[in-house]
UniProtKB/Swiss-Prot annotation:
It is found in: Cytoplasm. The gene is thyA. Belongs to the thymidylate synthase family. Bacterial-type ThyA subfamily. It is an enzyme of class 2 (transferase). Transmembrane segments: none annotated. One of its GO terms (biological process) is dTMP biosynthetic process. Its EC number is 2.1.1.45. Catalyzes the reductive methylation of 2'-deoxyuridine-5'-monophosphate (dUMP) to 2'-deoxythymidine-5'-monophosphate (dTMP) while utilizing 5,10-methylenetetrahydrofolate (mTHF) as the methyl donor and reductant in the reaction, yielding dihydrofolate (DHF) as a by-product. This enzymatic reaction provides an intracellular de novo source of dTMP, an essential precursor for DNA biosynthesis. This is Thymidylate synthase. Homodimer. GO terms for cellular component: cytosol.
Amino acid sequence: MKQYLDLCQRIIDEGVWIENQRTNKRCLTVINADLVYDVRNNQFPIITTRKSFWKAAIAELLGYIRGYDNAADFRALGTKSWDANANENEAWLKNPARKGLDDMGRVYGVQGRHWKTHDGTELDQLGKIVANLSKGIDDRGEILTFHNPGEFNLGCLRPCMHTHTFSLLGDTLYLTSYQRSCDVPLGLNFNQIQVFTLLALMAQITGNKPGLAYHKIVNAHIYEDQIELMRDVQLKRKPYPSPKLEINPDIKSLKDLETWVTLDDFNVTGYQHHDAIKYPFSV
């Protein structure tokens, strides 16, 4: 929690005003932020200085794992996080590649599970990684990436957290996640939970122990209409201790995650938090 608050304060103190062309808003921006999450000791990095809706973050992660490309499928899992980008993004609404209501296009999990190759076949990046790690294999290229510039025009949004690299030392699994851009008051809350949970799940289904998760952000920013709430409300609050994430031990394979796992298979214990803060969202 401290590293999150330190980053927010750093943006307030050192950030440079940048005009964002996509949203037509100004952002206070810093370059490079490194966060570390202790998955090994189950120090769940949920925000405590405001109420965090952790279930929506995990639901979104499950949708990525399953390769979903439709906001309705994400809603069925328990999150509305893709409704706006699928249905209110002006550029996407005009894009001939859009198939209709709730269509997201070839974003995130679609790339992770159905990457199109030069010969017209598909590559399941996540499936390959799980297969290797389950055998104790780390080829130094256990990389899951959603960043496919050749298909950016086929999706409603470029991936923000775009690449996850898994590393195996003995029977301990580590994760390094890379993010090109982060709306810190809103997006980082989701991203922290997802990085932590992704490592915990991957360790569990491959029979390894979770180690540390490293989260590297390039462009970290706070939008101009979020500054006052962050500076005068959230940063004035005292954080609570980190809670714990409980995952159903019966989840043992990628197929389990693809088929029967729901939000009921996750629980957060010991979560104390301050009141919710409604930050503006920029589409």
